[in-house]
Structures are given as C-alpha cells and as structure tokens.
Amino acid sequence: IGAAALVVGQYYMKQINGELSEMNSKISKLVDFQMAEYKGKVLTLMTQVKRASEFQTEILEDNNLRNEEIQRLQGLETTCMDLLNQANVTISDLSSKEGESFEKYDKLMSEVAIWQKYQGALTEVLYIIADLNYTLHLGAISKEQCYAAYSDMYDMENNLIDKLRKWHEFHKKKFKIDVDQARMERQGIDAVIHKPLELISEKWKYRNIGKEAVT
C-alpha cells in the first residue's frame, strides 16, 4: 500500500469513528420500550461498523485483514438496508393514515418522529459504510459503485419526504392549523362552547397546540 493512500485512509477512518460515536449517543437516548429489539439491532450495527474505524492501521496495512473487512462490510450494508427499509415502510404506512381528530394526528406525528430519527441515523450509517468501503478499496473501485446502495435509499427517502409533506398539508387544512401561531381553529362542541367568548376576543376562536406539534 502506498504511504499516501495509507495516510488518507487513516484520516478518513478517524473522521468516521467520531461520527459513529456521536450517532450512537443520540440513538441510545431514544426511549421507546416497544421498539427495544429494533433499537438494539441499530446499536449493534453501529458498534460493528465502528470497529472498522477503530482498528484503522491494522486493517489498512494488512491486505488479508482489509479484504476480510470488505466482505464483512457487505454483510453490514445488507443489515443496514434491511433496518432502513423497515423504518421507511413504517413511516410510509403511518403517513397513509388519516387522523380522525387532531389528537390522533398528533399521536401519528409522534410515532413518525421516532422512526425518522432511526431513519436519519441509519441513512448516515449507510453513507459511512460506503465511505469505509471506498477507503478500504484504496481507489480500486469507483465511488459510484461504493455509494450505489446509499444513492438508491436516498432517492427513496426523498419520495417519502414528499409524501410526508402532502400528509401534513392535508391535516393542516383539515384542522385549520396556523403553523406560524402554533394554533388551530376550535371544532365541534369546543367551538360551540367558546363561540360567545369570540365577541370578547378573536383569540377564543383558536386553541394553542404547541410549537412541537407544528415543527
């Protein structure tokens, strides 16, 4: 291995190691006991990917170890894509549901938000795996080949973002949500009860829903 290639490889490995440590910390803080098994698989994946960046010198300097690590990364890439697909499918399913009330819509949003955190972390891990793969090949294969899986998933997630945007727009109109003021028009019996108070102030026409519900 050329000295320049080794130095560059070690530099990228250190960067990757730091990124994974930060991501691991964020995922560890997510609390959802119903998703404990899924969370465990995500954390295990991160730990396994992190290993490649921790033993950077040994792996890069030994061709046998390097080839073994490349094979191992292929398996981790498949695992990452499986977990990411699960997150994407769940987000897609949730955003196909209509909230019958604002409370039910708010609950759906909370579920989507949790899955989006996993989605974001796993997308980063997939990118890091591509980075590692490219680094370990020392330029022997093209970037396009190394990042192919990441590119496919990235395109899929962009389509999902568009679906989510339309889903939020639908509910924004349905519940007459004012995003800027973090409020919505009262509906049903709530609107009837507060109707007389609207003569005093227009503010009684609305109910506050909190900034977290519209961000």
Model-assigned labels for residue ranges:
Residues 45-48, 52, 58-59, 64-215:
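Long, helix-rich, hydrophobic modules that act as membrane-proximal anchors or helical bundle/coiled-coil regulators
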Residues 1-32, 193-215:
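Membrane-inserting effector segments that mediate pore formation, membrane fusion
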Residues 6-64:
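Amphipathic, membrane-active segments
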